[in-house]
């Protein structure tokens, strides 16, 4: 898809006729990822901004891949819809999480999981065992969601350059993956 930007009604006074090309860096962390979705949604509303490249890690990498896939299929509106679909599916999946507030927490208005028996048990186990020991089947609910929402062929050939950083847990060295190298 050709990357063009039309003049927006919200275009800032005195800005050039050409769109402003921007690059984004998106950090990891589930709540940061959800927050970033809102920021990305707002940026994608602006015709005078054009995202040229995105670097990301963890939740930031997922946002980057979802945005790039959507953008490659239908521009900014499709990217916004892809991000909304992704985060809606993540939210729907969280309904079945064992990490829920107890009825007493709900009654008392406490939002923290600090007293959740399941959270405390998993937290203790994660300090003793590797996540791979606790998940021998290698299940990850995000895999199915990403497979459904992201078209990696479109990402590979898309107009937005992606740079996803991952760390090798054995060596501690980082590696940057680019568009054609990205998979789940």
Stretch-by-stretch model annotation:
Residues 18-25, 30-134, 140, 146, ...:
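Patatin-like phospholipase
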Residues 1-25, 160-161, 165-170, 176-180:
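Small-residue-rich anion-binding loops in enzyme active sites
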Residues 12-15, 44-45, 153:
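Short, flexible, glycine/charge-rich loop motifs used to bind or transfer phosphoryl groups or to couple energy/partner
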Residues 130-164:
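Active-site periphery "cap/insert" segments of enzyme catalytic domains
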């Amino acid at each position: 898809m050709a990357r063009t930007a039309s003049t927006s009604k919200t275009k800032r006074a005195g800005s050039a006729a050409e769109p402003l090309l921007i690059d984004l860096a998106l950090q990891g962390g589930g709540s940061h990822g959800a927050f970033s979705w809102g920021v990305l949604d707002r940026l994608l509303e602006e015709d005078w901004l054009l995202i040229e490249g995105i670097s990301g890690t963890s939740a930031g990498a997922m946002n980057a891949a979802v945005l790039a896939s959507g953008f490659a299929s239908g521009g900014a509106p499709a990217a916004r819809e892809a991000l909304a679909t992704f985060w809606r599916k993540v939210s729907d999946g969280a309904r079945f999480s064992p990490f829920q507030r107890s009825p007493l927490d709900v009654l008392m208005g406490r939002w923290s999981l600090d007293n959740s028996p399941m959270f405390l048990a998993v937290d203790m186990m994660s300090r003793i065992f590797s996540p791979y020991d606790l998940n021998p089947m290698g299940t990850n609910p995000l895999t199915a969601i990403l497979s459904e929402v992201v078209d990696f062929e479109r990402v590979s050939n898309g107009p937005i350059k992606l740079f996803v950083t991952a760390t090798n847990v054995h060596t501690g060295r980082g590696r940057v993956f680019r568009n054609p190298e990205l998979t789940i």
